[in-house]
């Protein structure tokens, strides 16, 4: 399945990706996975970065109130954590395309600016971003508090990348969500002891324990992470 996604991306430039291409890359691909907790939230297709959850709260509360009055189903209590390799070019391309798709008219200047973001040099770092989607906005508060209250020091020993041989690479820097729509960011050194921490033959696990109740655990196979003939992670 991942190979089909990569092939579809290779066949057309990122500026021509569909919404389906974007969502697949960000949420169900070699570079982006979804960890779900709670009830079935499969019917939701709108992913909200953790920075966007609070902004939606007021309008969703009003909508939910109207739904309750009309006898329609109440929100399902689920959380989806979208864990992505932001340092991988296809993920940045998907975020860039998401921005363009939100525009009514093509914007050449914005496209050029976004291309610069896609081509940014990540040769020294591995960056994992985590976006959040909730089925019930009442759940947003504690989640926001966990991400916004964390810092590099508190997460230094509870966030790491782990290779298939058991070797761990602990967090270098944490950045809480800001208004860029990409969520929280976990930054790691790409090189350890003079060698890249990961190679094409590796499997890697991302683990982040933010508090007693919130733990992220996502696994990736690097041999699937080829984009335009290059290993992207």
Model-derived features: positions:
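PEST-like low-complexity, intrinsically disordered acidic/proline/serine-rich tracts
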Residues: 9-233
């Amino acid at each position: 399945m991942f190979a089909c996604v990569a092939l579809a991306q290779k066949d057309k430039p990122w500026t021509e990706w569909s919404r389906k291409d974007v969502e697949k890359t960000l949420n169900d691909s070699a570079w982006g996975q979804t960890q779900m907790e709670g009830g079935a939230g499969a019917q939701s297709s709108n992913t909200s970065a953790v920075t966007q959850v609070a902004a939606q709260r007021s309008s969703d509360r009003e909508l939910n109130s109207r739904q309750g009055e009309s006898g329609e189903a109440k929100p399902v209590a689920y959380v989806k954590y979208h864990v992505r390799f932001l340092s991988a070019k296809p993920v940045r391309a998907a975020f860039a395309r998401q921005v363009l798709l939100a525009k009514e008219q093509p914007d050449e200047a914005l496209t050029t600016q976004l291309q610069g973001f896609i081509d940014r040099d990540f040769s020294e770092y591995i960056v994992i971003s985590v976006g959040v989607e909730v089925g019930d906005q009442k759940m947003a508060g504690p989640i926001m508090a966990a991400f916004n209250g964390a810092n590099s020091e508190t997460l230094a020993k509870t966030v790491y990348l782990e290779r298939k041989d058991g070797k761990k690479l602990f967090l270098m820097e944490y950045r809480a969500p800001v208004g860029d729509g990409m969520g929280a960011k976990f930054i790691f050194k790409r090189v350890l002891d003079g060698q890249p921490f990961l190679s094409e033959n590796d499997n890697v696990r991302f683990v982040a324990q933010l508090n007693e109740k919130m733990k992220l655990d996502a696994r990736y196979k690097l041999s699937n992470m080829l984009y335009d003939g290059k290993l992207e992670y």
